[in-house]
């Protein structure tokens, strides 16, 4: 059939219409999947908002065996939001009752972190400034993020985080609009954490880095701390980001970040309010994994 256009390229709309579904899911049982460690992320986009906080308040949120890292009299805590993709290599048709049905999952989560180290190794703690630490200066790898709370919107990721990494992990929901290769023109990071499948907000955040200069940071490998409540021992794992972070000093541009508390009754919100209080953010870091495929726009092949 002859083309109705005399040009080389088909008309491509600026927006397309896609279906919207209301999806509900009830647990019908359980299944087994490989307890894979290391756990591999196929793709990730992440942002950290860092705060100087009161060491005494931070220490009160740490479990037995961990103590807060102190930088020039302050502790360092962060709100870490991520969009991630994991491929499990196991799938089943459609909306099957066996998870993970599509062979993978896209999950979004918040980690509320306090930089800490094992009490048993406190004497070996490096003397660093916050700026040195965020640039990747801790070569001892004793300093790491204790995950006070992890709030995730994927039930499989919640179960795996608890079983494999002893995370204090809960199921929540998210709405967000963040920079991405397929979200052209979006420069602001904006996200809201809700109590699971409700409109009750836990917290919301907006980060606008426009006009701010970024420095490269070699943060990996990143140490994550959790706690084995049964053994009453701290647990560590090492997370490698295969790339460079972008690090922003916002100590003189604190209006770049806005975080608002919701009305949730979850203990997570109570702890966030106690930890961060009215503290102003001092730094932001971002990381995005490289794009692996790009399919260019269409053109008429008969020219």
Tell me the role of every PLM-derived stretch.
Residues 52, 64, 80, 121, ...:
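Arginine residue identity/basic-tract feature
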Residues 58, 116, 266:
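Functionally constrained cores in energy, signaling, and assembly domains
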Residues 62-64, 94, 163, 206:
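Surface-exposed beta-strand edges and their flanking turn/coil or helix-capping segments
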Residues 87-199:
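Aromatic- and glycine-enriched beta-alpha-beta binding-site module
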């Amino acid at each position: 059939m002859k083309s109705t256009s005399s040009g080389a390229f088909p008309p491509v709309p600026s927006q397309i219409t896609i279906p919207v579904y209301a999806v509900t899911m009830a647990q019908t049982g359980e299944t087994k999947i490989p307890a894979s460690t290391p756990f591999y992320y196929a793709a990730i986009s992440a942002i950290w908002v860092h705060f100087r906080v009161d060491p005494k308040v931070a220490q009160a949120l740490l479990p037995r065996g961990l103590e807060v890292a102190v930088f020039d009299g302050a502790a360092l805590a962060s709100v870490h939001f991520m969009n991630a993709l994991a491929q499990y290599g196991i799938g089943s048709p459609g909306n099957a009752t066996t998870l993970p049905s599509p062979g993978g999952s896209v999950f979004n989560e918040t980690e509320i972190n306090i930089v800490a180290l094992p009490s048993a190794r406190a004497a070996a703690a490096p003397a660093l400034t916050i700026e040195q630490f965020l640039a990747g200066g801790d070569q001892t790898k004793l300093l790491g993020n204790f995950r006070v709370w992890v709030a995730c919107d994927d039930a499989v990721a919640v179960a795996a985080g608890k079983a494999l990494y002893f995370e204090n992990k809960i199921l929540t929901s998210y709405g967000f609009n963040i920079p991405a290769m397929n979200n052209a023109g979006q420069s602001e990071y904006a996200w809201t954490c809700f109590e699971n499948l409700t409109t009750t907000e836990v917290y919301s955040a907006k980060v606008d880095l426009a006009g701010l200069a970024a420095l490269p940071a070699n943060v990996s490998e990143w140490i994550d701390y959790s706690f084995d409540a049964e053994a009453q021992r701290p647990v560590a794992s090492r997370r490698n980001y295969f790339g460079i972070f972008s690090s922003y000093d916002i100590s003189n541009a604190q209006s770049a970040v806005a975080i608002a508390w919701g009305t949730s009754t979850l203990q997570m919100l109570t702890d966030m309010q106690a930890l961060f209080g009215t503290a102003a953010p001092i730094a932001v870091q971002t990381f995005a994994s490289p794009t692996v495929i790009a399919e260019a726009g269409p053109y008429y092949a008969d020219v």
